[in-house]
């Protein structure tokens, strides 16, 4: 399990099965198989125990109404918070992908594991189910049925939920409920959640000290025109070798268009990046005139369209924890 050899085998004798009856046996078999999940990852992926948001992880569900729509999220409280070990706590908002859920992304990404080890709060928001009728030609394709999806196109679909308003209400509520360190609020997401992360980065970057979009680059489907409000954004983009689009930085593609945009936005040197490899990770770093890295891109070898706890640890330790954003909007690299 997670590269550690393990197995669990249940054996039922015919006589026992006869005594218990078919219904009980089916119930036990379902309980056995649903206690495990195979999550995406490098190579053959990873088997993990199922972790239920409330029953297993003790997360707290919060519900609010935004523009007449009932919305919710889960909050994970680390032991450091429960024991009152700090006056203020960093916050990570972790956003699920298309047709997924807050509960599903908690299991896949494992951000609560990082939070427990590093002492910060995690919020897993849930998208509102809708069909996406494509009032915007650059939006995601419509769905046959209402499906959880973030209205994250640029510009957003007119007939979809106002996601910026939702995240503003979410952050207001979380800051009212918990002692949040407002200089250390970060956001990450996968796939459609990566699109949402980039939408927040474009339209409402001021509260966030770090961004980590994984599994989708906005230049793949949408025009990457640099924002002009002067706010520095510091994203760490990640794409897998077998992701939705290519992970290559050769030629004109969604990756290069997105990276050129952020370099223009932040005043970074696109043509002379720093590159290095570490195992399956191929890193490209973009720096400003002072030599500070404010954007990075990572291509992951032998990776599908996924997000893993290992990546969550990397993002926090090697990126989020390095940055704070002052109340006046100034972004500071602590490293």
What are these regions (language model features)?
Residues 232-239, 295-298:
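Catalytic His-Asp charge-relay segment
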Residues 127, 212-219, 240-243:
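Active-site nucleophile loop of the alpha/beta-hydrolase fold
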């Amino acid at each position: 399990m997670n590269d550690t050899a393990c197995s669990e085998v249940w054996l039922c004798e015919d006589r026992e099965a006869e005594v218990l009856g078919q219904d009980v046996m089916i119930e036990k078999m379902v309980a056995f198989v649903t206690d495990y999940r195979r999550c995406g990852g490098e190579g053959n992926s990873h088997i993990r125990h199922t972790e239920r948001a409330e029953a297993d992880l003790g997360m707290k569900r919060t519900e609010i109404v935004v523009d007449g729509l009932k919305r919710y999220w889960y909050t994970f409280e680390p032991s450091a918070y429960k024991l009152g070990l700090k006056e203020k706590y960093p916050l990570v908002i972790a956003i699920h992908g298309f047709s997924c859920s807050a509960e599903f992304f908690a299991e896949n990404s494992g951000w609560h594991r990082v939070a427990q080890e590093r002492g910060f709060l995690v919020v897993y928001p849930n998208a509102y189910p809708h069909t996406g009728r494509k009032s915007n030609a650059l939006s995601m394709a419509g769905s046959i049925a209402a499906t959880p999806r973030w209205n994250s196109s640029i510009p957003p679909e007119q007939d979809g939920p106002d996601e910026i308003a939702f995240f503003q209400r979410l952050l207001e509520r979380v800051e009212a409920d918990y002692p949040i360190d407002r200089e250390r609020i970060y956001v990450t997401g996968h796939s459609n959640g990566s699109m949402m992360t980039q939408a927040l980065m474009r339209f409402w970057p001021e509260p966030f000290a770090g961004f980590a979009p994984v599994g989708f680059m906005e230049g793949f489907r949408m025009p990457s025109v640099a924002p002009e409000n002067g706010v520095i954004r510091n994203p760490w983009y990640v794409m897998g070798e077998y992701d939705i689009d290519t992970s290559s930085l050769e030629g004109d593609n969604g990756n290069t268009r997105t990276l050129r945009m952020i370099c223009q936005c932040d005043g970074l040197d696109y043509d002379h990046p720093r590159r290095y490899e570490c195992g399956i990770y191929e890193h490209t770093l973009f720096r400003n005139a002072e030599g500070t890295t404010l954007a990075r891109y990572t291509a992951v070898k032998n990776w599908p369209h996924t997000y893993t706890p290992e990546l969550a640890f990397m993002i926090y330790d090697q990126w989020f924890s390095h940055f704070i954003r002052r109340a006046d909007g100034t972004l500071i690299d602590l490293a």
